[in-house]
Curated annotation (Swiss-Prot):
GO molecular function: phosphatidylinositol-4,5-bisphosphate binding; small GTPase binding
Species of provenance: Candida glabrata (strain ATCC 2001 / BCRC 20586 / JCM 3761 / NBRC 0622 / NRRL Y-65 / CBS 138) (Yeast)
Localization in the cell: Bud; Bud neck
Name the record gives this protein: Exocyst complex protein EXO70
Alphabetical list of PANTHER family matching this protein: EXOCYST COMPLEX COMPONENT 7, EXOCYST COMPLEX PROTEIN EXO70
Alphabetical list of Gene3D superfamilies matching this protein: 1.10.357.60, 1.20.1310.30, 1.20.58.1150, Exocyst complex component Exo70 (1.20.1280.170)
Alphabetic keyword roster: Exocytosis, Protein transport, Transport
Residue ranges the record marks as coiled coil: none
GO (cellular component) term, any one: cellular bud tip
Function: Involved in the secretory pathway as part of the exocyst complex which tethers secretory vesicles to the sites of exocytosis. Also plays a role in the assembly of the exocyst.
Protein family: Belongs to the EXO70 family.
Signal peptide bounds: none
Predominant location: other
Length: 623
């Protein structure tokens, strides 16, 4: 037996083991390859199944969502249908307040659905409901607008003249109407501060007022009955037209306060937009009348004072509103005041013209046509006191007196008139200047008639050239008597005031001095002598004294005779003249008489009057 090598044996065993392992590994690999092939086939088979399963899951979710959406839309449709049924009953059946409540609910539902619109982008039924809601809301809001308009139209255009004549207030909405308008306006304003209802309110109210004012326009544009007829105060239809405009403005203020009581911030806009066309219509009629006045200033000029009052009233009523047509009012006011101010100058020029037309002095030295015309015109001015005062604002004396006027002929100097004089003071000054102008020009014309070959010396009681002072003084004072009578019996007395009356007294004093100027010359005769004692008078001195008494007697009797001819009728003027003559004459005559009454053997031959006689004769003449 051969001996076995151990190492070879180990190698053999190991080789056999490796061979066996290799075979097993090969078999495992074959199995793994088969498994891999089978897995790939399974993956190909189950992939579509899994994908379909996922699709089915998605479809399930969509179906569930759709079912929920359909249920939700059904609920919304049912809810909307309830509100729609109520709204379709209409405002008259449902009532205005419930109608707006239901409409608000529908509006809220629409807003909620619009916000959630993204969840229903492919739901045609949802969009149909949304569209229907919008249409229903729009239709209901249109009903509200129509209701608002119908309420506004419950007041129809009317003739304001009838209401004013019957003293009936302009039509106004009932509390219920105002409450309903407030409900409607509140709905739209709360919704979006929409200005639609404001615009409707502005349009309807403006149209109603314009149509009402149109009733009065034909009468407002008629100033006088005919072109050549003088205007009578208060006769123009424009005055009532203005009263109606002021009534409309006041009415509209109250209405807007009531309707928009909860919306103070929009009141100014609404009122401004309503009144703008009203003011424009007012200005249009006013300018039509002003054109007529300018073309017929002699007959219709005084109407401009009433126009001034009318404009002033409207300006005050719309003050602070910032109207678009505010400038129209301002321009109209300026044009009217230009006319009224021209009347002041025209009046002064007219006085001069009328006095220059005087060709003879009245035979009784009485009232002249110029005086009658002047005072008639000034009395007319007094009927328009308010308009005159308005026209006097911000003007000066230069408006009616030229800068070259003779200041000495007037009873007040320009330096005495302040730059900031009140309208009342300026009006008094104007009236007094008219009277001064009348008197000064009467004197100037009288001097020209009586002394045609010399330049008149006016307003000068001491003039040596004026040989007719007494006659001229009497002429002026007789005319001033009429002036004072008219002043006292009219509003001129108030308009002149204390200063104006003082100026009249100053004028009277001037021409009383004219009347007593000859009396003053008479007293001068008594002064021209050397005063010596009666004892030891020379014969020559006595002759001079006799001559002075003779001249005095003749002069006194001549003056008394002339004074009687004038036939003064004014008691106050008589008393004033008597007082002036006595005060001027008696002190000198008393002194002269006392010194020389015993100078003659037969005093009565040379001295015809004692001081008491003189006083009595003067008193009898001027009683």
């Amino acid at each position: 037996m051969n001996e076995i090598d151990v190492d070879e044996a180990d190698i053999l065993v190991l080789s056999q083991g490796l061979e066996k392992t290799s075979r097993l590994t090969h078999q495992v690999n074959k199995s793994l390859a088969k498994i891999s092939k089978t897995s790939a086939q399974s993956s190909q088979l189950f992939g579509p199944i899994l994908a379909r399963n996922n699709v089915l899951k998605t479809l399930q979710r969509n179906i569930d969502s759709t079912l929920n959406s359909v249920a939700s839309v059904k609920d919304l449709a049912n809810e909307a249908s309830k509100h729609e049924v109520l709204l379709r009953k209409g405002i008259a059946s449902l009532g205005l307040k419930p109608f707006t409540v239901e409409l608000h609910k529908l509006e809220d539902m629409y807003q909620d659905m619009s916000v959630g619109n993204s969840r229903h982008t492919e739901n045609a039924e949802f969009h149909g409901i949304l569209k229907h809601l919008k249409e229903m809301i729009t239709s209901s809001e249109e009903q509200l607008e129509l209701e608002f308009i119908q309420i506004l139209k419950r007041i129809e255009p009317f003739d304001p003249q009838i209401n004013m004549e019957k003293k009936i207030p302009f039509p106004y909405y009932s509390d219920e109407d105002i409450s309903q308008m407030l409900i409607i306006f509140n709905y739209f304003y709360v919704k979006s501060e929409d200005s639609r209802m404001q615009d409707i309110f502005i349009r309807e109210r403006g149209d109603q007022m314009l149509k009402s004012m149109a009733f009065m326009e034909p009468f407002a544009k008629k100033v006088t009955s005919s072109k050549n007829a003088p205007y009578e105060k208060g006769s123009s239809g424009f005055i009532n037209y203005t009263e109606a405009v002021l009534g409309f403005i006041a009415n509209e203020r109250s209405l807007i306060d009531d309707v928009f009581s909860q919306f103070a911030e929009i009141k100014p806009r609404v009122l401004r937009n309503i009144l703008d066309p009203i003011v424009a219509a007012f200005c249009k009629v006013l300018m039509s009348d002003l054109i007529f006045v300018k073309s017929n200033i002699d007959n219709a000029g005084l109407f401009s004072f009433e126009l001034t009052e009318c404009i002033s009233g409207v300006q005050k009523s719309v003050k602070g509103m910032n109207l678009k047509n505010q400038m129209q009012l301002i321009d109209a006011d300026k044009q009217v005041k230009d006319v009224t101010r021209s009347l002041f100058k025209d009046t002064v020029d007219r006085i001069k013209s009328k006095t220059n037309q005087m060709t003879t002095i009245p035979s009784d030295n009485g009232v002249t046509e110029a005086t009658v015309d002047t005072m008639s015109r000034l009395r007319k001015f007094s009927e328009y006191k308010t308009g005159c005062l308005a026209a006097m604002e911000s003007i000066s004396r230069d408006v009616w007196l030229s800068k070259s006027f003779r200041e000495k002929e007037y009873t007040i100097q320009s330096a005495a008139i302040a730059d900031n004089e009140t309208a009342a003071s300026l009006l008094s000054c104007f009236l007094s200047d008219c009277i001064d102008t009348l008197v000064a020009n009467l004197e100037r014309r009288a001097q020209t008639i009586l002394m045609p070959n010399q330049e008149p010396d006016v307003a000068n009681p001491n003039s040596a050239r004026n040989k007719f002072k007494q006659r001229i003084g009497f002429l002026v004072l007789m005319n001033m008597t009429l002036v004072e009578q008219i002043v006292e019996k009219s509003e001129l007395s108030v308009m002149l005031g204390n200063l104006g009356k003082a100026r009249i007294e100053k004028l009277k004093k001037r021409y009383v001095n004219y009347l007593v100027a000859d009396w003053k010359d008479l007293t001068v005769n008594l002064m021209d002598t050397v005063v010596i004692d009666s004892v030891g008078k020379k014969s020559k001195d006595k002759e001079q004294i006799k001559e002075k008494f003779r001249r005095f007697n003749e002069g006194f009797e001549d003056l008394i005779s002339r004074t009687k001819q004038y036939k003064l009728s004014d008691p106050a003027l008589k008393r004033l003249l008597k007082s002036e003559i006595v005060a001027l004459l008696m002190p000198m005559y008393d002194r002269f008489y006392g010194r020389y009454k015993d100078s003659f053997k037969n005093p009565r031959k040379h001295i015809k009057y004692t001081p008491d006689d003189i006083t009595n004769v003067i008193s009898q003449t001027l009683r």
